[in-house]
Amino acid sequence: MKTSIFKSLYFQVLAAITIGILLGHFYPQLGEQMKPLGDGFVKLIKMIIAPVIFCTVVTGIAGMESMKSVGRTGAAALLYFEVVSTIALIIGLVVVNVVQPGVGMNIDPSTLDASAVAVYTQQASQQGLIPFLMDVIPASVVGAFASGNILQVLLFAVMFGFALHRLGPKGKVIFDVIESFSKVIFGVINMIMKLAPLGAFGAMAFTIGKYGVGTLVQLGQLILCFYLTCILFVFLVLGSIAKATGFSIFKFIRYIREELLIVLGTSSSESVLPRMLEKMEKVGCKKSVVGLVIPTGYSFNLDGTSIYLTMAAVFIAQATNSHMDIWHQITLLVVLLLSSKGAAGVTGSGFIVLAATLSAVGHLPVAGLALILGIDRFMSEARALTNLIGNGVATIVVAKYCRELDEKKLDAELSGNNKNDNAATPTAQS
């Protein structure tokens, strides 16, 4: 029994994170030098994301009996994303107004160094709905795969899947090739995941070594407030949605515990995207639903990021004594409903969206971003964890609504009745 515990990815990642924290704290310079380990692991995962999405979506759509169900799944997913993201934005707004973490700081915006956030404000000026929609269309198919743009790959995969489905029996050879290729890709993922403890160790050692635990103290109230809000959202909002759908949020979190630890170590929810595709199929969701909901959710269903955006914007207003009445906050909410979709998939998207929002609202100082630039790294874990749980719950909800969920399989997997619960599966049945 002990041997199986020590060999489990869950234990190995947890141990790696602990060792990384200790190394970063006691030997900060050495901890900073561990950064390539974390970066390397995330790059390996990103290398495989595009082919995983392509294979999953194409085989899922091409293997469906009716194309009507694809449109129904997409519409249900987008409606769910918008409703739950709005709830996340509102919860962040309510909590930051009640706790008021920025009140009393009395920061003069003119004294802030805006040069540190100039790169984000410059990118923010280029964001918008039309540029975002145009960016979904790749200049070339090869370019979409080379850049790793999730939405571009998803668009091509959906079109390819539809075309393959229309070929009928003539397309079976291509379908079989892609399905076989999918098995190979998931085999590669299994190899990469063995390096997860090393990646988590390197990323955590670097974070603690560079920023130190002491940096959390100065703006600790905002960090604590944000973490508690994310916990509140997961267990109250997502927990209620899960209960209404017929499963326990606690059992689901236990089911994806390894993925959560990897995200905690790397601060990147993308690091477990391929593995989540596997696990959501294994839990009973049909491949076509998983292939559409998970990749799309990584751009449109960022619950943790939504909470962060409203809290950060109002915190800056409080810290700089910028007046925000109820109408200003409603305006902020409306702007965020649009802008939060505009920088999806962009590196540093949280800051870019926040900069764009502050500029759009007008009366909030964009230079105020400098206040949270230093602690943003410590809030990224909560954002990524909440985003991951939110996308997992969304997949099950949409699958059940579209009658593409095996509820007996869901109950068995979440209850741990399947002994191979955490084993990687090369492919899932559609």
UniProtKB/Swiss-Prot annotation:
Membrane association type: Multi-pass membrane protein
Just give the chief location class. membrane
**InterPro entries, alphabetically?**
C4_dicarb_transport, Na-dicarboxylate_symporter, Na-dicarboxylate_symporter_CS, Na:dicarbo_symporter_sf
Query: What compartments host this protein?
Result: Cell inner membrane
Q: Which GO terms describe its molecular function?
A: fumarate transmembrane transporter activity; malate:proton symporter activity; succinate transmembrane transporter activity
Instruction: Answer whether the UniProt record assigns the keyword Transmembrane to this protein.
Output: yes
Name under which the protein is recorded: C4-dicarboxylate transport protein
From the broadest rank down, the organism's phylogenetic lineage runs:
Bacteria, Pseudomonadati, Pseudomonadota, Gammaproteobacteria, Enterobacterales
